[in-house]
Amino acid sequence: VSDGGATALEATADPATGDDADAAGHAARRARFLREQLPDWIFVVAAVATVPLVLFVFGKDQWFLRDEWFVIAGPDGLQLFEPNAGSHWIAVPRLIYAVLWRVFGITTYWPYQLSNVLLHVLAIVMLRVIIRRSGVSNWLATAAAAPLLLFGPGSQAIVFGFQVGFTGSLAWGLAQLVLADTEGGFKRRDLLALGCGLLAITSSGIGVTTSIMVGIALLLRRNWRMAALHSIPLLGIYAIWARVEHASSGSQVGRPSAMELIRWDRDTIAATFAELAHIGVLGWLIVALLVVGVALAIGPWRDKPWDEIRRQWAMPVAMFVSIFIFASMTGMGRWFSGEAGARSSRYLYLQAVLLMPVVAMCAQEVARRWARLTPVLVVALVLPFPFNLSAFDDDIGLGKSFVEQRKYILTTAVR
C-alpha cells in the first residue's frame, strides 16, 4: 500500500513540479534575453539603421569637397605613394576613389559616402567588441558604443566621403586590435591583424597612432614579442615611405612651443569630454566616474588579482593613452589653427571613440559593486545622444547653397 500510495503521490506531484520547472526555465530565458540578447539586438539594429540615416538624412546634402578633387583630378587617380596634404599616406582612399570614379563619375555622391559610412560602422562595432572583451556588461557596452554611431559633434568623420582615410585608419586599427587579442604565439589571425594594420597606415597618418595603440595593448595583454611584431614592422614601413616621399607632419609656420602643444592637447581633449556629455554637469560626472572607477579597480578597494586587472584594462588603457599621442601628433602640424582647429569635428570623433572603453570600464566597476546603479549609468551614457544629433551639420564646408551651385555647374557645364 505504501508503494502504491507513494506512486500516487508522485503522480499527483509530478505535474506541479513540471509546471514549476517550466516556469523557472521561462523566467531564466526571459532574464537572459533582457540581460544579454536585448542590448545586443538594440546595437545591431542601431548599426544597420546608421547607414541609411547617414546617406539619406544627415548627409544627404554632402558633395565633393576639398581633398577629394585632388584625388579625382589626378593624372590617373593612382598615385598610391604620393603624400596627401604633405603628410598622409592615402593609398587605400586613392584606390577606392579610382574605382568609384570609373563606375559612377561625379553624377552621384552616395557611393563615395557609403564607403566611409561602412568603415565608420565597422569602427563602432569593433569598439563594442573591445569593450565587451574587457569585461563590460552587454547593457553598458551598448550604452557606451551605440551613441557614437550617430555622434553629431564628429559628423565630419561620418558624412564626408573622403574621411574614408581618417575613419578607415581607425576602423582598421581597431580591427587589428581585436584580431591580435588572442593567447599564445603567432597564429593565422595575427597575420590577418597585420593586414588590417597595413590598411590602417596606408589609409591616413592615423595609422601611426593605431599601430602604437596596438603595441601598447599587446604589451599589457600578451607579451613584448607580440607587441613588437604588431607595431614595429608597420611603423617601419610608414617611416620608410615618409623618408622616400619626403612626407612631413610639420606645418609651414614651424613647430609649436611646448606650451602651445600643451594648450592644443588641453583644448582638444576638453572639447571631447564636453561634446560627449553635451550637458556641462554630465561632463563633470564622466570625469568623476573615471576617478571613482579607477580607484575601485586599482586602489585599496581592489578585489581582483593584478594579472586579471592588467588583462582586462589593457585595451582600454592603450586606447586612452593613444588620445594623448594622437592629440600631440596632430598638434605638431595644426597648432597654429588654435582652439577652433583643436575642436575639429573629425578629431573629436576619433578621441571620443578612443575614450569610451575607459569610461565603460569605470562604469562597470561601479555597477559591479552597486548593481542597482546600472540603469542610472546606462541612462547617463545615452542621455546626450538626442542632443548630439542636432550637431549634425549638412552645411559642411562653404554651405549648402555653395555645394548645390558647384554641383550644378560641374555636372552640367560639360554637356
Task: Give residue ranges: language-model regions.
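Signature aromatic-anchored transmembrane alpha helix within multi-pass, membrane-resident enzymes
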Residues: 231-235, 316, 364-390
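Membrane-lumen/periplasm interface segments of multi-pass, membrane-embedded glycan/lipid transferases
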Residues: 7, 65-111, 231, 239-302, ...
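Transmembrane-helix signature of polytopic, membrane-embedded enzymes
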Residues: 127-151, 170-171
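Short hydrophobic alpha-helices at membrane interfaces in multi-pass membrane enzymes
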Residues: 178-200, 225-230
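Transmembrane-helix motifs of polytopic, lipid-linked glycan transferases
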Residues: 114-137, 175-179, 292-299
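Membrane-interface alpha helices of multi-pass inner-membrane proteins
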Residues: 189-205, 210-218
